[in-house]
Swiss-Prot record:
Single Gene Ontology BP annotation: translation
PROSITE patterns to which the protein is assigned, alphabetical: RIBOSOMAL_L14
GO CC annotations, alphabetized: cytosolic large ribosomal subunit
A matching Pfam family: Ribosomal_L14
Listed name of the protein: Large ribosomal subunit protein uL14
Keywords annotated in UniProt: Ribonucleoprotein, Ribosomal protein, RNA-binding, rRNA-binding
Organism superkingdom: Bacteria
Stated family: Belongs to the universal ribosomal protein uL14 family.
Summary of subunit composition and partner proteins: Part of the 50S ribosomal subunit. Forms a cluster with proteins L3 and L19. In the 70S ribosome, L14 and L19 interact and together make contacts with the 16S rRNA in bridges B5 and B8.
Cross-referenced NCBIfam families: rplN_bact
Lineage: Bacteria, Pseudomonadati, Pseudomonadota, Gammaproteobacteria, Aeromonadales
Amino acid sequence: MIQMQSMLGVADNSGARSVMCIKVLGGSHRRYAGIGDIIKVSIKEAIPRGKVKKGDVYNAVVVRTRKGVRRPDGSVIRFDNNAAVLLNNNQQPIGTRIFGPVTRELRNEKFMKIVSLAPEVL
């Protein structure tokens, strides 16, 4: 469950290390974002010579949350951290690699590129 001011890790090799959610997209007063939702983020920490720099604003898709996601069979998939993948204006990932596991729910959300790059899909 991600809301404004939430800090997230970055699960790709775009050069960002941590980002802060500045807006949850998809509704005028939408408060929370879960796995597969698009948020607006500001880069808070970045590595030198990366594709992005500190202070930049991007869209990102949430790929892991501590809150997790409930499956139709009643099981819940939870993670140890909150993580997002940065997107460009065409909703494609900026990085060329994805780190850590992602959930099968991203497949329904038109993020097949992220699912195919991920080392593990839960």
